[in-house]
């Protein structure tokens, strides 16, 4: 339960997502694939800047919303995992 009750760990995860975006940014293609079809070929792409900033910004929103409902903490960690997967698949 430490991950869910400690605000420092939560904001550390948000900061880690932004750091990952900054580190991976020069290595990413101009268009990042964010969805794949059944044949494992990308069928939806976004701009590199949008792809690296979109999920960390959502993490900030959910981290602030945890004051309203503690279940938003789960969303922050799930978005961190999704962000890591998207960055790795885009390389």
Swiss-Prot record:
It is a multi-pass membrane protein. InterPro entries: DUF1648. GO terms for cellular component: plasma membrane. The keyword Membrane applies. It comes from the Bacteria. Signal peptide: none annotated. The chain crosses the membrane at residues 9-29, 44-64, 71-91. It is found in: Cell membrane. Pfam families: DUF1648. Induction: Expression controlled by a sigma-Y-regulated promoter which needs the sigma-Y factor for the binding of the RNA polymerase and subsequent transcription. This is Uncharacterized membrane protein YbgB. It comes from Bacillus subtilis (strain 168). The lineage of its organism: Bacteria, Bacillati, Bacillota, Bacilli, Bacillales.
């Amino acid at each position: 339960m430490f991950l869910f009750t400690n605000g420092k760990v939560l904001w550390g995860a948000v900061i880690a997502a932004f750091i990952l975006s900054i580190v991976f940014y020069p290595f990413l293609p101009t268009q990042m694939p964010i969805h794949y079809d059944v044949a494992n070929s990308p069928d939806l792409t976004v701009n590199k800047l949008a792809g690296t900033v979109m999920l960390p910004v959502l993490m900030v929103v959910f981290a602030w919303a945890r004051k309203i409902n503690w279940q938003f903490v789960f969303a922050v960690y799930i978005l961190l995992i999704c962000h890591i997967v998207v960055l790795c698949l885009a390389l």
